[in-house]
């Protein structure tokens, strides 16, 4: 086989412009079927959900070689791209030469033709990219990342890397993982008997970040608009289909945006991502719609159709109380001051308004210290974007720009000033109105793929008792 | 001041198309000078290195307000964009209204007009984005990230997220940070008295990854081509201008690429990034050239000019031995089997070839277990891209695709098979020739910015005894 012949990606070959030409296709065997005269091999190379049909005339190929071509094997094929006579594909490759790169013993290869449960595939996360489902999901994941970078780049916002290892634990977003190089069998101790973190790698106690927001704000107060896109961590012992210990987050932070501008940005942003998916991933989305979630495409179009409803928390509570009065049953009680549960959010979105909702002006007690206090002294300019099926997809706020108010709120919430001296500096010197929000990347992917378990939209999920691979 | 008037970014206003129009500019004061009749304010909003000159006729503004406009203050200005009479700028804004968002007390604001050392600025990493130098660096950092995504996206390679928290420590790339939720004051113990990591969050001992390569290969063996772009960690106690404990790495991994293809990819990739910088960041690069590194632009063009020299390690050693014979002095000894030091790499690039060098076919003893063994049984298909000033900028290899050879090499290098069962599966089932490499993002930035300390090209550097902010 001619090693120097350029490889053609199956996605490109399927477009049909190369019909009549000799091409070189490489990929993994999905299925092989046929009769005594001819074999049909469905080959996939990851460039598309669609396989290329390889037609091998058995008169031209060694039977021993052909018998090695089983599901999961990797082969290279040279042949002529022709219009297909069969149903199910428009073009196929009439093979003139086949090279086997790697076999896959049918007796042990875990991914045979038959369907597998998602649970089983999680146990072989190193092989699941070879399935149709996960090829689809990882391609969509890629496209959503590119959409995000493109959106912000076009706005003139800069991609900014917040640190992962942090000595700060004031964000209040959740439990943290400790990062250390101390030997647990010979921990250094202070005179008082405490672990002496001055001897640790960073000379202090350090953890994995739960958010890059505070550092991102420092950059926004100089560069104008920035966004982070990086991993964040939560050490909560939450074994649910919605929680990961390690996940990716996008956090734009923009100077001179007030809460209304922030809502505009969030709505434009998420619609841009969904539109990108429909424009660029339709083959993959159709596969998921067919196999997992018949309503997926309708749900994606649903969020594009109308402006999101903008709703103050207080009004939202009134609607939910009204619903309860009219006989709607919720698991969790609803009252002014309560943190909304997913059931409440979904009621507002799916039943009451039938459109995504941006809820604002939450009671200050249930939100973080850095959110801008409203004139009523009771509510803050937080905003959550609520979506069908998944509830909260974005959380953000206008930030408190006033130094004195910020210090007062930090004190109220028990955040020590000495831990946020640098954050306070941004309000001490040249403060400006600014806003931002966070989007959990995997939450977005749950929405765009229609998958129901977050472990299926990240390549190697980290959850309690699970860090394999 | 009209709150609803749309803000114009200074980068856009400076293009001049808006001359004669009333615009709204917001940003931070770099300097203010003037006389009794008029003040000139240099305003920067992060959209460009260039400031907008604001002209304030003192007859129209309150003296008390004007006195608050000092270096570091944040203001909004409405005024008419006019062609400038003064030298140094083509347009300026004749202010009709000024709003002060935040003052910056000259008695305490750390960034006064005078120059600051880079060492001092590292201590106020939360404020250094407000300097010209770091505005420039973070904009270039953004552009290089966008260049990287664009390059791979255009090739049809997928952005793939390898896990950060890992139970695997077989890559051999360096010391690792432990990740734990165990309470050091009440560590669970096994019957044998060891720390019982089964009680830790993930049910086992976990660390921060040193590379996403092995997981990336799993994806390449299904999706064809992927790249990672994420943080990686090294716990080495290296307090040098070239080392970080937390840094970002780009690791493409591509099926069906052999070593020559891999060299082509690396060369095309890095030239693409450098060309992008010259095309999109010239104002910022010119600033760095003027203030830090007069040879910067020449060095950037240098790598674009010629094909990189491709040189086998054995031949490289011969050249270096010849140089020693001719009187060249190196600090470290040179002999076949030695790991090259930066001085050797730079000699080859800067003195001998006067072009970047891709060195290949290293002795297997000094490279990782996963590199493809050559037929000589002594060398492996590793490749390092060597650059002027910084030495190695990329390290990669063709990967060992043969199951038996890979197992043998793992055993030789002391990598336990039980720890890489999943990695070996990729060679057990449908293996394929494939290659990849790693580029340290901050190494690229050192090259593109000409900065000499790696702590100055990442927003919040993490190094021994340093995790502030």
Curated annotation (Swiss-Prot), chains A, B:
Family recorded in the similarity comment: Belongs to the class-II aminoacyl-tRNA synthetase family.
PANTHER family recorded: ASPARAGINE--TRNA LIGASE, MITOCHONDRIAL-RELATED (PTHR22594:SF34), ASPARTYL/LYSYL-TRNA SYNTHETASE (PTHR22594)
Protein EC: 6.1.1.22
Quaternary structure and partners: Homodimer.
Keyword terms, alphabetized: Aminoacyl-tRNA synthetase, ATP-binding, Cytoplasm, Ligase, Nucleotide-binding, Protein biosynthesis
Keyword Cell wall biogenesis/degradation tagged: no
GO cellular component: cytoplasm
BP terms from Gene Ontology: asparaginyl-tRNA aminoacylation
Source organism: Porphyromonas gingivalis (strain ATCC 33277 / DSM 20709 / CIP 103683 / JCM 12257 / NCTC 11834 / 2561)
Keyword Protein biosynthesis found: yes
MF annotations from Gene Ontology: asparagine-tRNA ligase activity; ATP binding; nucleic acid binding
Catalyses which reaction(s): tRNA(Asn) + L-asparagine + ATP = L-asparaginyl-tRNA(Asn) + AMP + diphosphate + H(+)
Compartment(s) where it occurs, according to its Swiss-Prot or TrEMBL record: Cytoplasm
The protein's name: Asparagine--tRNA ligase
Any single Pfam family the record assigns to this protein: tRNA-synt_2
Entries under PROSITE patterns matching the protein: AA_TRNA_LIGASE_II
NCBIfam families the record matches: asnS (TIGR00457), PRK03932.1 (NF003037)
Enzyme class: ligase
Entries under InterPro entries matching the protein: Aa-tRNA-synt_II (IPR004364), aa-tRNA-synth_II (IPR006195), aa-tRNA-synth_II/BPL/LPL (IPR045864), Asn-tRNA-ligase (IPR004522), Asp/Asn-tRNA-synth_IIb (IPR002312), NA-bd_OB-fold (IPR012340), NA-bd_OB_tRNA (IPR004365)
